[in-house]
């Protein structure tokens, strides 16, 4: 089953949106297999955003993600990477549709509440970066047969 990585950024944690974000993914039928509240080290932030290292906004990304607690999560389900991106909305909240997390709660691109992996390969890399294998729990919800054929 496909997995994706999500992180509620410091602004989402401070605004008490963690429960609402989890609710949306559970309501969709996805399974939470990893969850932790953590302070992100500068090293982890630089690895996570490594593809942007040469861009002028890189220092601001690192500074922001390390400015407060983050809730890191791994979700599992059919097509979860693409579905999560739709639930999250466009990177710039001003371009996000109402009904998406960023469309409903975001105002500024630099404070866009949540990160979600953009591809299956990216999700695999990010999950390995943020979680040890023992931190991921395999389990079977009783409602699975009501969601998937």
From Swiss-Prot:
GO molecular function: ATP binding; metal ion binding; nucleoside diphosphate kinase activity
Function summary: Major role in the synthesis of nucleoside triphosphates other than ATP. The ATP gamma phosphate is transferred to the NDP beta phosphate via a ping-pong mechanism, using a phosphorylated active-site intermediate.
Keyword Nucleotidyltransferase: no
Enzyme class: transferase
Catalytic reaction equation(s): a 2'-deoxyribonucleoside 5'-diphosphate + ATP = a 2'-deoxyribonucleoside 5'-triphosphate + ADP; a ribonucleoside 5'-diphosphate + ATP = a ribonucleoside 5'-triphosphate + ADP
Active site, UniProt feature: 115
UniProt GO cellular component terms: cytoplasm
Protein name listed in UniProt: Nucleoside diphosphate kinase
Documented EC number(s): 2.7.4.6
Pfam families: NDK
Family statement: Belongs to the NDK family.
InterPro entries: NDK-like_dom, NDK-like_dom_sf, Nucleoside_diP_kinase, Nucleoside_diP_kinase_AS
């Amino acid at each position: 089953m496909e997995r994706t990585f999500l992180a509620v950024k410091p602004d989402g944690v401070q605004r008490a949106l963690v429960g609402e974000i989890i609710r949306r993914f559970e309501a969709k039928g996805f399974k939470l297999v990893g969850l932790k509240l953590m302070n992100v080290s500068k090293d982890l932030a630089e690895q996570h955003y490594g593809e942007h290292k040469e861009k002028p906004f890189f220092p601001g990304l690192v500074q922001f993600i390390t400015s407060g607690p983050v809730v890191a999560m791994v979700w599992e389900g059919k097509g979860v990477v693409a579905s999560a991106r739709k639930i999250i909305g466009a990177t710039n909240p001003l371009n996000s549709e109402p009904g998406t997390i960023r469309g409903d709660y975001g105002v500024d691109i630099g404070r866009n509440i949540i990160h979600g992996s953009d591809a299956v390969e990216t999700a695999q890399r990010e999950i390995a970066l943020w979680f040890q294998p023992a931190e991921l729990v395999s389990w079977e919800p009783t409602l699975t047969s009501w969601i998937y054929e």
